[in-house]
Amino acid sequence: MSQLETRTEPMVVNFGPHHPSMHGVLRLVVTLDGEDVVDCEPVIGYLHRGMEKIAENRTSVMFVPYVSRMDYAAGMFYEAIVVNAPERLANISVPKRASYIRVLMLELNRIANHLLWLGPFLADVGAQTPFFYIFREREMIYDLWEAATGQRLINNNYFRIGGVACDLPWGWLEKCQDFCDWFGPKIDEYEKLITNNPIFRRRIEGLGAIGRDEAINWSLSGPMLRASGVPWDLRKVDHYECYDDFDWDVAWEKEGDCYARYRVRIEEMRQSLKILRQACDMIPGGPTENLEAQRMAEGKTSPFMGFDYQYVAKKVAPTFKIPNGELYTRLESGKGEIGVFLQGNNDVTPWRFKIRAADLNNLQILPHILKGAKVADIMAILGSIDVIMGSVDR
């Protein structure tokens, strides 16, 4: 008697763009053969707002409030990159104290970014409790941001060409140290709950594995790259701001799967705490902004006693011109390498302003690592990438 063969027709299923596990308005057109993923096509662009064209029609300081809407989970990374580009092109130095303040804000953003990744990722794989814990810690970071910038999450508008908008208020550094002392044991609490949990490990170990060469060839960055055995961190490589003043290590793993990406982000939060503690202890005195970018006159060539040269605006001067030239500048955000290609033509607005989003590049590998996976694993693999669609679509 011949054995009966069961044949299934491929089925096309749409995930998103309104499903909560999509982490924004992302749509996945998935082709299934039973429970197995045969193909996946990400459909992006639902949150496109023309950020690059807006930048090309705004002065450098006018564009800063826009950028935190791109990565609305940790917007100060984009604030930093859009002021770093004109600073380097115009050769404007940043005072040491301002650089330390920037590092404090960026590392708080990194922790907040990883926390907001951790909660939904664990909820996607079935662990609901930590989702509520992460907002307890983020609330303390919100309080620190509110005290320093006036805003709690987005539109902090704190970074300026040549420094920051204002100095830290009295007692802020002590509050930041209190947060570091309080948050360290909370990371241990997460690890006790999650890291060696046998159910969690069986659920995600081996899922979405990416080899070292694959990660490099797909231009991955951030935790996606470091979890695949490449200890590449722009804070160490490019030596920007004052990261060389601190003692910290690059977090990386070799396995390249969802579990390795989780371990990298947990360790990155520990390293961010180390940097925060050192920055609070070592921060120097001095100014928090370079006034040269705020003078109405064009640089040091104008008469020193002239009215325009002596007048210093509260913000970057509206006559600040981006010099002729072009450059690409980058930094390490919580999701990976974000960068700006800036082309100036001696005008107050840039000729070209190209934004490189880390999560857009990281998302491109999703169809490759989903093929052969089970339909139930789609959310776990997508969640491990950490995408924010405001940044992907721009």
Swiss-Prot record:
Pfam families linked to this entry: Complex1_49kDa
Principal location class: membrane
GO biological process: photosynthesis, light reaction
Membrane topology value: Peripheral membrane protein
SUPFAM superfamilies the record matches: HydB/Nqo4-like (SSF56762)
Keywords carried by this UniProt record: Membrane, NAD, NADP, Plastoquinone, Quinone, Thylakoid, Translocase, Transport
EC number of the protein: 7.1.1.-
Full protein name: NAD(P)H-quinone oxidoreductase subunit H
Disulfide bonds: none
Catalytic reactions on record: a plastoquinone + NADH + (n+1) H(+)(in) = a plastoquinol + NAD(+) + n H(+)(out); a plastoquinone + NADPH + (n+1) H(+)(in) = a plastoquinol + NADP(+) + n H(+)(out)
Quaternary structure (record): NDH-1 can be composed of about 15 different subunits; different subcomplexes with different compositions have been identified which probably have different functions.
InterPro entries: NADH_Q_OxRdtase_suD, NADH_UbQ_OxRdtase_49kDa_CS, NDH1_su_D/H, NiFe-Hase_large
Family: Belongs to the complex I 49 kDa subunit family.
Domain of life, source organism: Bacteria
UniProt keyword annotation of NAD present: yes
Gene field: ndhH
GO cellular component: plasma membrane-derived thylakoid membrane
Localization terms from the record: Cellular thylakoid membrane
GO MF term set: NAD binding; oxidoreductase activity, acting on NAD(P)H, quinone or similar compound as acceptor; quinone binding
